[in-house]
Amino acid sequence: MALIGIAFSLGFIVGPMIGAQFAMSLKATSQFYIIPALFAFTLAIVDIIFLICTFQESLPPEKRAHSIASSFSGALSYINPWLLLTFKPVQKLSLRDHEALQKCGFIYFLYLLFYSGLEYSLCFLTHDRFQYSRMQQGKMYFVVGLAMAAIQGGYVHRIPPGKEIKVCLLGIVTIIPSFIIIGISWTPSMLYFGLLLYAFASGTVVPCLTTFVSKYGGPTQKGTILGIFRSLGALARALGPFLSATVYWWAGPVVCYIIGGCFFVIPVILLRNMQKCLSGQPQVYT
């Protein structure tokens, strides 16, 4: 999971700089956003072609759905928010493991709900308060990406098994002052100090929670478990920016970031309680 996180961080380094370069070179045109969008679309197509050509389907033919219609009804359970939060599609787990997944999934959802919203509002804040240009915002994300890559490459992949929740707690606790500092920052130096704390949380929380969840279930269940887990993250990322932007434009950046930062106390408390309730390792499934 740390290697996946490093790959994500590298994309976080290169992507914003490419977008900023496009925006600056095309700023004289009224539709400067079209070329970056087409470039991203082309990369996605190339990625799909690469996957098709280099990866083989792991599901044996005899276990695949016989028709699209027969699998469509089952797919609906993977987009129902309530079924996702309760991990209902996951079958044949012990009650203890199922409850642990539900708690971890809910914590992950809350964390990304608050995180994605404040992350989305960051461009508004830097433009309104510091008059950052597109290139300056790209450089800002470049620095954050470098910090994330260093944290994941030098620290996260060395975390011993069983310590994921402890590191995750540290990451969420760190992001509380991070967003508060960003919200009240009046100089670029203060902003970047908050961003470095933000980078630590960004580089630790999601990889550690994903690693923790991946320990549950048997070989035939892990795909479903991780798929539901990632779907919860996507749902949070869909709702978070809307909620955060509403507060940002209604009450201002200071209130938005202070309240948003304090909201992270909720997943900290829930994760701490879950840590106390867990004892031993997940059940081994075959």
Which residues make up each language-model segment?
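Glycine-rich segments within core transmembrane alpha-helices of 12-TM secondary carriers
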Residues: 1-23, 44, 232-240
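Helix-to-loop junctions at the C-terminal end of transmembrane segments
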Residues: 23, 150-164, 248-249
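A membrane-interface helix-boundary motif in multi-pass transporters
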Residues: 23-41, 244-268
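Multi-pass alpha-helical transporter architecture, strongest
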Residues: 45-55, 182, 239, 253, ...
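Juxtamembrane intracellular "pre-TM" segments in multi-pass secondary transporters
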Residues: 58-106, 128-129
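Pair of pore-lining "gating" transmembrane helices in MFS-fold secondary transporters
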Residues: 97-122, 196, 200
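Short amphipathic helix-loop junctions that connect adjacent transmembrane helices
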Residues: 120-136
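C-terminal transmembrane helical hairpin of 12-TM major facilitator-type secondary transporters
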Residues: 163-209
